[in-house]
Amino acid sequence: MAMERQMDMQWWLDSKFGLFIHWGPSSVGGVEIGWDRRSHPYDHPGRARIPDAEYDQYYTRFNPVEFDADAIVLAAKQAGMKYIVFTSKHHDGFANWHTQMSDYNIANTPFKRDICRELADAVHRHGLKLGWYYSTRDWYHPDYLVGDNSKYNDFYHGQVRELLSNFGKVDLLWFDHVAGTWADYRFRELFEMIHKLQPGILVNNRAARFVFGHKAGTPDPELAELVKGDFDTPEGKIGVFMKDRPWESCIVMSRPADGGGWSYRPEAITRSFAECAKTLSACVTGRGNLLLNAGPMSTGQLRPEEMGLLKAFGPWMQTFGEGLYETQGGPYINGEWGGATIRGNDLYLHVFEWQNGALALPALPREVLACTELGGEDVACRQDSNELSLTLSGEKNRDTHSIVKLSLADGTDIPLIPTDVASTAREQVSALEDPMGDN
């Protein structure tokens, strides 16, 4: 990674944890945002449950009078999240701001207030970083894929321009999918505009997602590199350990039995705090971030279970955050047992599975000066030339996995250390994985 880009990304690399918010008129029906709309002018059949005429009228009843941007932003901040990515527009084409490019927007609902404006102001007010999710795919717009593609480019470039011009500092742009051919889009023009309007902004890997992998022609290497963006976005799963390519897993807090759960679905079951905390550690030890998704209700509030989950993270992060923030995954490569992070001479073992209160790992090339479990009990540590062994001293009950801090003596950089066959395979696969591939 070039030094200048490394500096632009450092805040994100250090942050580890963000809040994803999917919200719009679909919450009125309690259906999946975008995907439950029947017509998809694209080759993915989707869920397709709700007739267009019904879905496209949800906005006439969208009146989230209990929406409080400050309350949501503060809940994220108190949970230890450092940035928020909000759905400005999803695949259904509805804009959560007062866009001049379309009448299908929040200004024409009973609510009328500019949700993006209120959210952006709250994020800036409380010191977090702001990201916009923007779906280039638009199943409402008459020119998307089936009409005048030049007009569609003008439309979506215009909306992106508004998002990057009218809301102050924007730190991240999170595109989501587009189909068609390379000739259908003006990607160079788009990226030039993005970086001119918001120097230093980060862009994910989905600006041209699904153009890759189709019979759409082959772009020149410079264009392919441009649209690859700054980081990958494994969806609904934990990314693999990658040495040289940043990534961020996006995962829902609440999931219905039939999948999805990005937006509010009343039947969805919220994951346990222990599962979410483990997921965060699994991402960070793999050198990734976690973007944990919430879907507000039609009232504008988060469902109580999701708000409770955010509240549970607060005290946990106060105790365990030092093993996450501003660290780098490694040197131990993730295995079934857990993974590791390191910052300077402090190495943190995120232990998901103890074997009768013990853990054995390959030896480190540095002396271990001290060993303690964060928020827990004393840990006996012994290291010889072949093995590092840890043993818990008691039978303390734990609500979540353990994070054990090792204080190391000064020494040379520690190389990556495979801990089992599976972790070695994951590292090899990560080097071959197409960062534009489908997640």
Predicted regions and their residues:
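Mature catalytic domains of secreted/periplasmic carbohydrate-active enzymes
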Residues: M1-N439
